[in-house]
């Protein structure tokens, strides 16, 4: 009785020493009613406004730790937060439809310090054109990373104008675009800090006879990674690859043409390569042996190159003694086997990861790998007709450092799993898939003998459910397909 609740919010005036030119959010405090018979009095208690006293740099750090959705919500609080959030944004991904052109001035006036930009367009829509890309480059002169996906309306002229405005670019990734060699050369000639270049399905390069060579340009001195995927006439990038003396990683996938001769020239000129991926290329032992000049080679991926044999692998292994990761998928060609793997075991003693798909090693090579490669921690054997219980038992007994093992589509049975449960003391994860002779009873065996081991078991056969299973048993870290 005698009390009333007021809904009016009273804001206090800021002290003169706290006032500044920036706009601060206004805070209100609860009104505390004082009980009096006929007159209600209110006392206003002012809470300190610590947030508004934070410098812009500190506020930006807070925003950077938030999710994208939370950042958007924060930008609606006040004008200052909107400005700071826009200036501190590190990455922006946009639907690159043609109507984006009209939004460029307002959008990039807010995000005027953006370092990373992704522009994606779907196949059924008309993408942005040269005018929009040039407008973006004028607003984002500090851009260091650009990703273009299906921007089919961009031409060589647009890429050239972009390169003139964004000379600090360090990373460029483009896929399903239609500009050609002139546009790519403009990037290489105007972006001396470019370190990473990824090109996928560049439609502007069609005729091999008339195609303009790409590179090397000013970017050749700084490039460290080049990835080419599904590029017709990818050999046009030969001058760029050869001229990139500091190149560390080269990835070639599904690029047409014969690559043997070019790989030989590349290996002779670019000897500092540490990682090479060759996938679905027309390459033979000549091309596979070429990286033998790269004495610092640490990672080699050889995927679906049916013309490569043990001969090429031996030549590479004899000189590339720092090899740490070897990935071989020969697509059931059965031309790489014990001879090549024995050479790897003899010369590549630093091997840490080995993935064999469609390869048929026997106990001979596996035992030598286990004995010599004492640092081997990750091993995958997939689609092999020769990896059975004997080979798995050998691995269990000899691979002391092994931490992760994957076995798929191999003639392994419960006997091999039992040997595995008793061996490999440092093993932390095992994956067994589509090995039909392995039963789900191995799950109990691993649980009893190696309780901390993470096991993923899928034999490919339906599993009969046990009604008595469960109860107080701890949950197993085993994936069972039913």
Describe every region a protein language model picked out.
Residues 1-163, 168-226, 237-242, 249, ...:
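N-terminal adaptor-interaction module of cullin-RING ubiquitin ligase components
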Residues 2-45, 207-229, 234-303, 307-482:
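C-terminal capping region of solenoid repeat domains
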């Amino acid at each position: 009785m005698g009390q009333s609740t007021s809904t009016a919010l009273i804001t206090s005036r800021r002290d003169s020493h706290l006032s500044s030119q920036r706009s601060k959010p206004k805070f209100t405090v609860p009104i505390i009613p004082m009980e009096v018979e006929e007159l209600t009095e209110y006392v206003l208690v002012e809470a300190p406004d610590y947030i508004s006293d934070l410098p812009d740099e500190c506020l930006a750090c807070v925003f950077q730790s938030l999710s994208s959705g939370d950042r958007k919500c924060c930008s609606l609080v006040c004008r200052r937060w909107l400005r700071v959030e826009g200036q501190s944004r590190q990455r922006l991904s946009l639907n690159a439809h043609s109507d984006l052109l009209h939004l460029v001035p307002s959008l990039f006036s807010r995000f005027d310090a953006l370092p990373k930009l992704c522009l994606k367009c779907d196949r059924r829509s008309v993408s942005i054109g040269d005018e929009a890309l040039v407008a973006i480059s004028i607003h984002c002169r500090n851009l260091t990373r650009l990703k273009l996906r299906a921007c089919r309306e961009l031409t060589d002229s647009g890429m050239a104008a972009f390169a003139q405005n964004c000379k600090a670019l360090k990373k460029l990734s483009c896929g399903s675009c239609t500009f050609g060699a002139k546009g790519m050369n403009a990037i290489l000639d105007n972006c001396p800090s470019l370190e990473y270049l990824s090109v996928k399905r560049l439609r502007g390069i069609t005729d091999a006879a008339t195609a303009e060579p790409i590179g090397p340009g000013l970017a050749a001195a700084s490039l460290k990674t080049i990835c080419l995927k599904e590029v017709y006439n990818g050999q046009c990038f030969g001058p760029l690859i050869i001229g990139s003396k500091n190149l560390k990683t080269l990835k070639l996938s599904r690029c047409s043409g014969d690559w043997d001769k070019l790989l030989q020239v590349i290996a002779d000129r670019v000897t500092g390569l540490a990682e090479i991926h060759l996938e679905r290329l027309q390459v033979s032992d000549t091309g596979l042996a070429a990286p033998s000049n790269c004495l610092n080679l640490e990672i080699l991926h050889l995927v679906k190159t049916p013309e490569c044999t043990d001969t090429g692998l031996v030549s590479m292994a004899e000189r590339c003694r720092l090899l740490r990761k070897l990935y071989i998928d020969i697509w059931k060609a059965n031309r790489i086997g014990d001879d090549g793997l024995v050479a790897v075991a003899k010369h590549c003693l630093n091997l840490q990861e080995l993935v064999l798909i469609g390869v048929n090693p026997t106990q001979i090579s596996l035992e030598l790998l286990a004995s010599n490669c004492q640092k081997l921690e990750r091993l995958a054997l997939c689609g092999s007709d020769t990896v059975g219980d004997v080979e798995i038992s050998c691995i269990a007994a000899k691979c002391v450092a092994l931490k992760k093992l994957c076995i798929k589509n191999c003639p392994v049975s419960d006997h091999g799993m039992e040997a595995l449960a008793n061996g490999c003391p440092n093993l932390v994860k095992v994956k067994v898939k589509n090995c039909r002779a392995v039963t789900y009873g191995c799950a109990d065996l691993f649980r009893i003998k190696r309780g901390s081991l993470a096991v993923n078991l899928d034999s490919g056969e339906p599993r009969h459910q046990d009604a008595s299973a469960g109860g107080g048993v701890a949950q197993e870290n085993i994936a069972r397909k039913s």
